[in-house]
Amino acid sequence: MTLDLPRRFPWPTLLSVGIHGAVVAGLLYTSVHQVIELPAPAQPITVTMVSPADLEPPQAVQPPPEPVVEPEPEPEPEPIPEPPKEAPVVIEKPKPKPKPKPKPKPVKKVEEQPKREVKPAAPRPASPFENSAPVRPTSSTASATSKPAVSVPTGPRALSRNQPQYPARAQALRIEGRVKVKFDVTSAGRVENVQILSAQPANMFEREVKNAMRKWRYEAGKPGSGLVVNIIFRLNGTAQIE
């Protein structure tokens, strides 16, 4: 024979049941004691007509304006009297002294000297020893009056000498020039050892002179050294060889 023991409920379940029961009891209590307020009966509405002039606020009374006090005019300053102008002092210029008249120079009287009478010389009697033949000049006098013969050096004869070309820069600037050149002539008649001795103006005509002299030709078989020529450039575009 077995006995049935009552089952034990877990404590979380009991706690939940207690909380719910408390909430239900509270709701019941508040619903019983709640007072229901009825709305008040409607009352009639009264309307009063008011004019807009009554609603305007009263204007503030402005105080009367204060009288404007005009400032007293300032006294005008008394004019300062100007000092009397002094009369300009006139300085009298001294009168120029009259220049003394130059005294006339005394004219020296030229005393005329008495002319001396020149008596003609009496003719001298011819001496028998004088020679009436004309005097011949001595040999020393003749040698002094005669000019010695100057020997003209014979150099190479030029066959063709082309004129140098006028530089375009000098022609544009309208500049004339002069170049002095020293050179040698070989036995074949060619020019070599060209040296510029002077050039006016410098660095203007030298290159054209050297280029032209390379084409010069002289007579073969007659060499020469230290020959000097002057080349003058004119504004008309020509060159003169001296």
Swiss-Prot record:
<feature type="repeat" description="1-5">
    <location>
        <begin position="78"/>
        <end position="79"/>
    </location>
</feature>
<dbReference type="GO" id="GO:0031992">
    <property type="term" value="F:energy transducer activity"/>
</dbReference>
<feature type="repeat" description="1-6; approximate">
    <location>
        <begin position="80"/>
        <end position="81"/>
    </location>
</feature>
<dbReference type="InterPro" id="IPR006260">
    <property type="entry name" value="TonB/TolA_C"/>
</dbReference>
<feature type="region of interest" description="Disordered">
    <location>
        <begin position="55"/>
        <end position="166"/>
    </location>
</feature>
<keyword id="KW-0813">Transport</keyword>
<keyword id="KW-0080">Bacteriocin transport</keyword>
<keyword id="KW-0677">Repeat</keyword>
<keyword id="KW-1133">Transmembrane helix</keyword>
<dbReference type="InterPro" id="IPR049924">
    <property type="entry name" value="TonB_pro-rich"/>
</dbReference>
<feature type="compositionally biased region" description="Low complexity">
    <location>
        <begin position="132"/>
        <end position="153"/>
    </location>
</feature>
<feature type="compositionally biased region" description="Acidic residues">
    <location>
        <begin position="69"/>
        <end position="79"/>
    </location>
</feature>
<dbReference type="Pfam" id="PF16031">
    <property type="entry name" value="TonB_N"/>
</dbReference>
<dbReference type="GO" id="GO:0015031">
    <property type="term" value="P:protein transport"/>
</dbReference>
<dbReference type="InterPro" id="IPR003538">
    <property type="entry name" value="TonB"/>
</dbReference>
<feature type="repeat" description="2-3">
    <location>
        <begin position="97"/>
        <end position="98"/>
    </location>
</feature>
<comment type="subunit">
    <text>Homodimer. Forms a complex with the accessory proteins ExbB and ExbD.</text>
</comment>
<dbReference type="GO" id="GO:0015891">
    <property type="term" value="P:siderophore transport"/>
</dbReference>
<feature type="repeat" description="1-1">
    <location>
        <begin position="70"/>
        <end position="71"/>
    </location>
</feature>
<feature type="compositionally biased region" description="Basic and acidic residues">
    <location>
        <begin position="108"/>
        <end position="119"/>
    </location>
</feature>
<comment type="similarity">
    <text>Belongs to the TonB family.</text>
</comment>
<feature type="repeat" description="2-7">
    <location>
        <begin position="105"/>
        <end position="106"/>
    </location>
</feature>
<feature type="repeat" description="1-2">
    <location>
        <begin position="72"/>
        <end position="73"/>
    </location>
</feature>
<dbReference type="GO" id="GO:0055085">
    <property type="term" value="P:transmembrane transport"/>
</dbReference>
<dbReference type="InterPro" id="IPR037682">
    <property type="entry name" value="TonB_C"/>
</dbReference>
<dbReference type="InterPro" id="IPR051045">
    <property type="entry name" value="TonB-dependent_transducer"/>
</dbReference>
<protein>
    <recommendedName>
        <fullName>Protein TonB</fullName>
    </recommendedName>
</protein>
<feature type="region of interest" description="7 X 2 AA approximate tandem repeats of E-P">
    <location>
        <begin position="70"/>
        <end position="83"/>
    </location>
</feature>
<dbReference type="Pfam" id="PF03544">
    <property type="entry name" value="TonB_C"/>
</dbReference>
<feature type="domain" description="TonB C-terminal">
    <location>
        <begin position="151"/>
        <end position="242"/>
    </location>
</feature>
<dbReference type="GO" id="GO:0098797">
    <property type="term" value="C:plasma membrane protein complex"/>
</dbReference>
<feature type="transmembrane region" description="Helical; Signal-anchor">
    <location>
        <begin position="1"/>
        <end position="32"/>
    </location>
</feature>
<feature type="repeat" description="1-7">
    <location>
        <begin position="82"/>
        <end position="83"/>
    </location>
</feature>
<feature type="repeat" description="2-2">
    <location>
        <begin position="95"/>
        <end position="96"/>
    </location>
</feature>
<keyword id="KW-0472">Membrane</keyword>
<keyword id="KW-1003">Cell membrane</keyword>
<keyword id="KW-0653">Protein transport</keyword>
<keyword id="KW-0735">Signal-anchor</keyword>
<dbReference type="GO" id="GO:0030288">
    <property type="term" value="C:outer membrane-bounded periplasmic space"/>
</dbReference>
<keyword id="KW-0997">Cell inner membrane</keyword>
<feature type="repeat" description="1-3">
    <location>
        <begin position="74"/>
        <end position="75"/>
    </location>
</feature>
<feature type="topological domain" description="Periplasmic">
    <location>
        <begin position="33"/>
        <end position="242"/>
    </location>
</feature>
